[in-house]
Design a protein with these regions (language model features):
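Alpha/propeptide regions of enzymes that mature by internal proteolysis
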Residues: 1-321
């Protein structure tokens, strides 16, 4: 039985997908004990990047058409609006660490390819072969099918990991990391590392981030739109639903089909929200009382948005990570 949530969850951190839960617990512990926002977000993202069980982020990520794992990550400081990102990097163990350090720069803060890897080497950040045997085998088996362009879609179950955090004083920040679309063309980049589209943070209002089919998300500044609606007085949950609906309707009018988009957000008071075009999108909220899993849902016939707290039956039967 689904019990709909009437009020927005409250907390200091929010993240996308069930795969982020362990990392969010670690990040939340740092935030509660030390109130170090950047450290908390980076730690939470790194936990997902390091886990080969999650094939859309970091180590074990599914490769591009040539069998190489290409990674994107970004970090934004809501106090300064400083943003760092690395794009299309290979063999970098924790792209979020590089993005975080770059966010402190005034210029040259978004680096791609070889330039990003040279920076990581200069900073002494660890490298490793990011392609696991499991991902390699899946690639070898499925490349024979030569997946058609129109068949590519965001992962069933999980995609970009997005972490938003808020300090006790109201500072906001967010970090995102992904290995991108499976079997993508080499060099393909989605929405994740692009400010305003894949993420946005402004401590004067709040922060938001998106996950799903990047080519659809970056046809507008979805994350920025959510934060602006919060700034203009909309409750965070309403801002998520309204911004996503406006964005999706804009695409639908032009003949696009629903390939999956989801968003999370938090205002600078700690009110959290999420919305999706999927039937189910799990997200995690953390604060002084620990972590709690929630699910955003959209009725595929009516378009109605709602949140619910999953029960034991849902947790047992759901295949969504």
């Amino acid at each position: 039985m689904i019990t709909k949530i009437l009020n927005s969850p409250m907390g200091q951190m929010i993240s996308t997908w069930r795969m982020s839960e362990e990392g969010l617990r670690l990040g939340n512990q740092i935030l509660q004990e030390k109130d170090e926002l950047g450290e908390a977000i980076v730690r939470a993202v790194k936990c997902v990047e390091d886990n080969p069980a999650y094939v859309s982020v970091g180590y074990g990520g599914l490769p591009n058409r040539e069998g190489q794992v290409e990674l994107d990550a970004a970090y934004m400081d809501g106090d300064t609006l400083g943003t760092g990102a690395v794009i299309s990097v290979k063999n970098l163990k924790n792209p979020i660490e590089a993005a975080y350090r770059l966010s402190k720069r005034k210029t040259n803060s978004i680096l791609a390819g070889d330039g990003a890897m040279k920076y990581a080497s200069y900073e002494g950040l660890p490298c490793r072969n990011m392609l696991t045997e499991s991902s390699r085998k899946r690639y070898e088996e499925e490349k024979k099918e030569q997946m058609k362009e129109e068949e590519r879609r965001a992962y069933e179950g999980h995609d970009t990991v997005c972490i938003i955090g808020r300090s006790r004083e109201g500072s906001m920040a967010c970090g995102v990391s992904t290995s991108g679309l499976y079997m993508k063309e080499p060099g393909r980049v989605g929405d994740s590392p692009f400010i305003g589209s894949g993420f946005y943070a402004d401590s004067e209002a709040g922060a938001a981030a998106a996950t799903g089919m990047g080519e659809d998300i970056m046809k507008g500044c979805l994350s920025f739109s959510i934060v602006e609606k919060i700034r203009n007085g909309l409750p965070v949950q309403e801002a998520c639903e309204k911004a996503l609906e406006e964005h999706w309707k804009r695409l639908e009018r032009r003949g696009y089909t629903n390939r999956g988009m989801s968003v999370i957000a938090m205002d600078n008071q700690g009110n959290a929200g999420a919305a999706t075009t999927l039937e189910e999108f799990p997200f995690v909220v953390a604060g002084e009382d620990g972590c709690r899993l929630y699910v955003a849902s959209m009725d595929q016939e009516t378009g109605e948005h709602f949140l619910f707290a999953p029960d034991e039956e849902w947790l047992k039967n759901s295949k969504v990570d």
